Amino acid sequence: MANSRRVEKLAALLKREISELLVNGIRDERIHQAMITITSVEVSGDLQHARIFISLFGEEKKKDQVLVGLEEAKGFIRAELARRLQMRRSPELVFKIDKGMTKGPEVLDLLNALELERKSKDL
């Protein structure tokens, strides 16, 4: 099991390199139909698995196509990561949509409603 500093370093490197690949390295048109942002990367302690959290901005139908494109490009992305980072084995990649970006406004609305309710009770 790798130490936490090594895990964090690999997560940062993966985020940087995958972001670069998404912009310049992958030619699949499906991936370029929506704006993709990597919000975070979580790497397992044994460095064998990585969850890449992404936010997608664009039409819902196109978001699904982007995810299909990413799934099909996994092998290419892993091979490029192994080559660029000079790793014997690159981690198994799992792309997940980051729900935090969409839930943020809902949480703020709830907090604002609670604040208004509290102020009305104080009056």
Swiss-Prot record:
InterPro entries: KH_dom-like_a/b, RbfA, RbfA_dom_sf, Ribosome-bd_factorA_CS. The keyword DNA repair does not apply. It is found in: Cytoplasm. The gene is rbfA. One of several proteins that assist in the late maturation steps of the functional core of the 30S ribosomal subunit. Associates with free 30S ribosomal subunits (but not with 30S subunits that are part of 70S ribosomes or polysomes). Required for efficient processing of 16S rRNA. May interact with the 5'-terminal helix region of 16S rRNA. It comes from Prochlorococcus marinus (strain NATL1A). One of its GO terms (molecular function) is ribosomal small subunit binding. Coiled coil: none annotated. This is Ribosome-binding factor A. HAMAP family: RbfA. Keywords: Cytoplasm, Ribosome biogenesis. One of its GO terms (biological process) is maturation of SSU-rRNA. It holds the Pfam family RBFA. It comes from the Bacteria. Belongs to the RbfA family. PANTHER family: RIBOSOME-BINDING FACTOR A, CHLOROPLASTIC-RELATED. GO terms for cellular component: cytosol. The keyword DNA damage does not apply. Monomer. Binds 30S ribosomal subunits, but not 50S ribosomal subunits or 70S ribosomes.
